Amino acid sequence: MLNETNFLYEENAKLIGNRYDIPEEVLHHIKNVLNKFGDQKTVKGYKRANHLLNNPNQPFVNLVMIKSYFDNVDKDNVNPVEYELNGGEVMNKWVQELIKNERIRVN
């Protein structure tokens, strides 16, 4: 496990200064979710959703945190509004694929 952790750290270090534009389809999904659940300002993910809409060009480190959310969330027990405010499956698929491809690219 230590070698794998070191390997991921080295890959991430090569990408740390990069920024990425969130695709329109992901932003559109987040905007729709905010419109639908705009009254739920205390739900985890609300601030992130607003931040992503206002700042669609995100540093790699923020995308890693989003990936970590999806990697660790218990889909069977998560508040569905929270999950959607974090981007839902649209964001999950995009961020997983982006980070995987970027890590391959820098190897």
Language model region names:
Residues 2-107:
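Extended terminal accessory/targeting regions
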